[in-house]
Amino acid sequence: MAIRKYKPTTPGRRGSSVADFVEITRTTPEKSLTRPLPKKGGRNNQGRITTRHQGGGHKRAYRLIDFRRYDKDGVPAKVAHIEYDPNRTARIALLHYVDGEKRYIIAPKDLTQGTRVESGPNADIKPGNNLPLRNIPVGTTIHCVELRPGGGAKIARSAGNSAQLVAREGSRATLRMPSGEMRFVDVRCRATVGEVGNAEQSNINWGKAGRMRWKGKRPTVRGVVMNPVDHPHGGGEGKTSGGRHPVSPWGQPEGRTRKRKASDSQIIRRRKTGKNKR
């Protein structure tokens, strides 16, 4: 993938860029692998906003992605097409299995039309093949990693992301996550070899607010520019700092306020955050 930049013919075009989509081989999805995706606008079943800054955007169909691949062990497949998916930053690959079934997977880097892929403990170590961590050599770059055996891929699924198998001892493997975090994962968990493709996606300059609206993202208004009735940071004469520690519109402290999860016990070294990133 490469980035195509526009000439500044209008203010919205100035500095904006798009993906060139050269790797895409088909523009219409496989109909049997799509489902309707109704718009919620960030509302729940009571009509109340539960997720702010969502709404509008282009109509989409959801593509069913195979994040497990267990039931296709030993069944080879051929990459029929590399396709665009509006629901994720990565590209997706349509697989035609020799038994006649078709499935989508996340397309790794360098996976091309006509490539043979397979899954299972005896699969070769090459991009697109899915194996248990106990069968993958230490040092291999992987993506679409499970956190629990049989739970489906959860880690390193977006464009350009990958994890690395750093060590393996007994029933646990050590992974270096995309964030730099180090954690233990069961060696029975599956992962796909290679890194996710479309890495240049992060370099796209969207150019104008309207392109974000096409994606279904609405404006994020700062609390300090609101009125007191709308936000705890609102009001005041002139420009103010808010006058208190950052809080949500409902007065709850913002930032890292979540309790630890049970799986946090598997973390060896946390990712660097804030000032520690430097």
Curated annotation (Swiss-Prot):
Annotated Pfam families: Ribosomal_L2 (PF00181), Ribosomal_L2_C (PF03947)
BP GO annotations: cytoplasmic translation
Biased composition (Basic residues): 268-278
Disulfide-bond pairs as recorded: none
GO cellular component, one term: large ribosomal subunit
Biased segments, Polar residues type: 43-53
Chain segments carrying region Disordered: 28-58, 223-278
GO MF: rRNA binding; structural constituent of ribosome; transferase activity
Chain's role: One of the primary rRNA binding proteins. Required for association of the 30S and 50S subunits to form the 70S ribosome, for tRNA binding and peptide bond formation. It has been suggested to have peptidyltransferase activity; this is somewhat controversial. Makes several contacts with the 16S rRNA in the 70S ribosome.
Family statement: Belongs to the universal ribosomal protein uL2 family.
Name of this protein: Large ribosomal subunit protein uL2
